[in-house]
Structure formats: structure tokens, C-alpha cells
Amino acid sequence: MKLPIYLDYSATTPVDPRVAQKMSECLLVDGNFGNPASRSHVFGWKAEEAVENARRQVAELVNADPREIVWTSGATESDNLAIKGVAHFYASKGKHIITSKIEHKAVLDTTRQLEREGFEVTYLEPGEDGLITPAMVEAALRDDTTLVSVMHVNNEIGTINDIAAIGELTRSRGVLLHVDAAQSTGKVEIDLEKMKVDLMSFSAHKTYGPKGVGALYVRRKPRVRLEAQTHGGGHERGMRSGTLATHQCVGMGEAFRIAKEDMAAENQRITALRDRFYRQLEGMEELYVNGSLTARVPHNLNLSFNYVEGESLIMALKDLAVSSGSACTSASLEPSYVLRALGRNDELAHSSIRFTFGRFTTEEEVDYAAAKVREAVDKLRELSPLWDMFKEGVDLSSVEWAAH
């Protein structure tokens, strides 16, 4: 077993060796290095063929038409293109948007920007289980609502929203639905023939593909219109200009092909690993699972260890690569905004650790990690005067602390 152990698969995944092999064939002079937009020679035609094959592979994972897949640089760009693109195009119909408080920053910062431009945004509060329900969305709908944006799987707590039901509601009310699915490809079944979703964002690097490439699904029937955010050569049917990186697109296509093939078996294996890990911690005092344990992807376990500061626990677990909060906000010492929205107090939000498992995680690693976590938590609690007070039966919420 090699140390440190990587248990942060929701931040990024390593590229699958099969993906790396396919990508390497699109780089060198004797490989498929051409510009897919070069229409006058065989190098361009071959590159275009590879890119279109990859587009088909992405579409097949989510049961979409390849013509509905637009290449982007990642899910952040896809979220921006979908939300700003729709808001601006349909602004004459209305300027009200609905999203949730626990979306990824790529969605929240985009809606904040639209608020500065005069749009009105309603931020839904999830239940304690971390889920956004159709009833919550329905209660917020107005006559001037043009877009609802709700994530499929939450990046911090791994909860799965019932997108099919939310889609039935939005379609019946003539409102467009955007879904950030960066964390769900290869983990949850997605069928865009059945789901009434209008726009969906994807990322390659959360699914064992390369960083720097993603895609946006844009429904053709009924047709969704977007205002482009990047202008140039009119690539991707005018929605997203810029020379396509053949090797990146091919990498994402291969990653999604493997995801489609291996998803059922992989989910079974990873569920067993997560449950094995959790069983070894379950008996600990003041241990809380954040988010629903049932409506959740197998890869994620987000735990709060009360009376232990999350950052100090991460430092104590130097052999484990884990995180508190999402990778995009893990540099901030603020408590997780996702856990605060679930109703967790600051102390519990601060004491949370996200463990995420993946394709290359082994049983041996999981057992080692669980033992290390128990050891570190016990040690840090021994040092904590708050833990002593709690053990003595002091109600810490009623203590009036002296100010300095």
C-alpha cells in the first residue's frame, strides 16, 4: 500500500490509463494532431472524426442526441454558458431565476453576477437531508421565472436530487431546467430521453478523464436557445467558439464510454468500500453523517466529528488526502456553506470531513484510513477542554464565554 492515500475523488479523479492512451494518440506529428475545423485536408477530417466520435460517446452515457452536446472547457464554463446564456436570451420573457443555496460556486457566483445585472434570484433552502424537492421549486415559481438550476448530485455531501420529478414540474410550467451533473456522471443513471431537463453540465475530470474539458447538453426538442458567451470562429454551432482540443475531447469521450460500461459493477464495489469504512467508525461518540444516507452516491461520506476542528483533523491525517468542503472553497476557513444551509451549527460544520472513494481505492486503504481517523479523533478530543466539559455533562450551548 502506497502512502498518502487518495480519498478525495470528488475534487478530481486520476485519468484512467485507457483514457491517457487514447489522448496520447492525438498529440504528435504521427498521431491525430490536426485541427478539427480544418476542412481542406485529411489531418482536419481525421481530427473532426475523432471529436465527433467522442461527442457520440458523451451523448451515449446520458442517452442524448450527439447534436445536443456542446464542448466546453469544463463544468464551470458549462454552468456559465447555460445560466447566463438562457437568462440573457429569454430576458424579455422574465428576469426571475430559481436555484438552491447548496449549488456549486460555479452556479452561485453566476447567479450573483446576474443579480448585479438586474435579474432576481430565489435561493432555495434544502431540508436537513440536503435534498431539494419539487414542492420547494413549485412554491418559488412565478410568472416571470425563466430558469431553474438545481444540481443532480451535491459535491460536498453526495446527495441525489430527484431531477426527473423537478423536470416534470418545470416542463409543465414552461420554465427551463438546468442541471449541474458534474458529480453524477458514471455514478447515477442519467436518461435525457426520459428526463425533462433542458440543459445539463458535465465535467471530464470528475469521471476519470482529463481536466480542462467538459460539455453542455442543450436540448433540441423542444429547442433551447442560448446567447453565446464566447465569440470567435462560430464553432459548436455558434454557441461556443474556439478551436477544439482533439486530445481533450477524445479523453472525455473514452472516459464516458468506460463509465457507461463499468458503472453498475463499480458502484457496487464502491458502495461496499464506503460501508466498510463507515462500519469501522459508526460506534464513535458525537459522529454525524451530513446529508441523506439513502439518496446519496456510493462514493461520498461526509462526516462531522463534534468537538474536533476539521482543519486540525486534516492536518493530523497527513497520510490521507481528504477535504473539508469542496476543493474550490477548501482554502477558506469559513464553515461549509452547504452544511450551514442544512441547519448544522458552526461547530459541526467546522468539524466536517469529506471522504470520497473511487476506482482505484482498495479495501486495505479503507481499513487503514478508518483506523487513522479513529486514532486522530481520539487524540484531538483528549486535548480538547470542550470534550472534557461535554463528558462532564456541561451543556456547552448554555455556556457564556468571557470576551477578551
Swiss-Prot record:
Pyridoxal 5'-phosphate binds at A75, T76, N155, Q183, S203, A204, H205, T243. Signal peptide: none annotated. [2Fe-2S] cluster binds at C328. Coiled coil: none annotated. One of its GO terms (cellular component) is L-cysteine desulfurase complex. Transmembrane segments: none annotated. It comes from Ectopseudomonas mendocina (strain ymp). GO terms for biological process: [2Fe-2S] cluster assembly. The active site is at C328. It catalyses: (sulfur carrier)-H + L-cysteine = (sulfur carrier)-SH + L-alanine. Master enzyme that delivers sulfur to a number of partners involved in Fe-S cluster assembly, tRNA modification or cofactor biosynthesis. Catalyzes the removal of elemental sulfur atoms from cysteine to produce alanine. Functions as a sulfur delivery protein for Fe-S cluster synthesis onto IscU, an Fe-S scaffold assembly protein, as well as other S acceptor proteins. Belongs to the class-V pyridoxal-phosphate-dependent aminotransferase family. NifS/IscS subfamily. Its main location: cytoplasm. Its EC number is 2.8.1.7. The modification N6-(pyridoxal phosphate)lysine is found at K206. It is an enzyme of class 2 (transferase). Its cofactor is pyridoxal 5'-phosphate. InterPro entries: Aminotrans_V_dom, Aminotrans_V_PyrdxlP_BS, Cys_deSase_IscS, Cysteine_dSase, PyrdxlP-dep_Trfase, PyrdxlP-dep_Trfase_major, PyrdxlP-dep_Trfase_small. Keywords: 2Fe-2S, Cytoplasm, Iron, Iron-sulfur, Metal-binding, Pyridoxal phosphate, Transferase. Pathway: Cofactor biosynthesis; iron-sulfur cluster biosynthesis. This is Cysteine desulfurase IscS. Gene3D superfamilies: Aspartate Aminotransferase, domain 1 (3.90.1150.10), Type I PLP-dependent aspartate aminotransferase-like (Major domain) (3.40.640.10).
